[in-house]
Regions:
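Glycine-rich beta-alpha junction loops
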Residues: 44-48, 134-136, 159-165
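Charged, alpha-helix-enriched surfaces in structured cytosolic catalytic cores
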Residues: 14, 135, 139, 151, ...
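Rossmann-fold NAD(P)-binding glycine/threonine-rich loop
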Residues: 83-98, 105-146
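Glycine-enriched alpha-helix->loop->beta-strand junction motifs that scaffold or abut catalytic
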Residues: 99-101, 162
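General beta-strand structural signal in soluble alpha/beta enzymes
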Residues: 61-63, 70, 78-79, 103-105, ...
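N-terminal glycine-/serine-/threonine-rich beta1-alpha1-beta2 phosphate-ribose binding loop
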Residues: 1-98
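Conserved anion/nucleotide-ligand pocket segment
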Residues: 146-169
Length: 169
């Protein structure tokens, strides 16, 4: 059997809890498509005692999200904390500096520190994935990067944000 991709998840609000539920509910399908299982192994959130409607007892709990980056049993860190600076940025830097892949939906952090983080990821040979932060999660980044590889795209203008779409509708 192929080794699982081991995930450290920071942030257990609506989105973080949803990630765990989706990975549980669709485990077999995800494993077939990814050619390996994806398992959350460690988690972190501000309030350990908050009821979230899911069983978290099977995961290692860390009180400081930045500890996820240093864990030997974590291959990729998913950040769903939010905020341009503070714990989210520290976690991003430490994860990428450790040569581990980093996934985020954090628009604010990417707007303020995206170039820095992309540079660090490139230097360390890690992946920085932020598809969920763009266009309400519509997979446009991968499509543009891979599907338009022979074209030079200088910029794209428009409202491609799920929050704006929700407000405007």
């Amino acid at each position: 059997m192929t080794q699982p991709l081991r995930v450290g998840l920071a942030g257990l609000g609506t989105v973080g809890g949803g990630v765990i539920k989706i990975l549980d509910t669709n485990a077999a399908l995800i494993e077939r498509r990814a050619n390996r299982p994806i398992e959350v192994v460690a988690i972190s959130a501000r309030d350990r005692s908050r009821e979230r409607g899911i069983d978290l007892s099977r995961f290692a709990w860390v009180d400081d999200a930045t500890q996820l980056a240093a864990r030997d049993d974590v291959d990729v860190v998913v950040e769903l904390i939010g905020g341009a600076d503070g714990p989210a940025l520290t976690l991003a830097r430490e994860t990428l500096d450790a040569g581990k892949s980093f996934v985020t939906a954090n628009k604010a952090m990417l707007a303020h520190h995206g170039l820095e983080l992309a540079g660090l990821a490139e230097i360390k040979g890690a992946a920085l994935k932020y598809e969920a932060a763009v266009a309400g999660g519509i997979p446009v980044i991968k499509g543009l990067r891979e599907g338009a590889a022979a074209n030079v795209i200088e910029r794209i203008y428009g409202i491609l944000n799920g929050t704006c779409n929700y407000i405007l509708s």
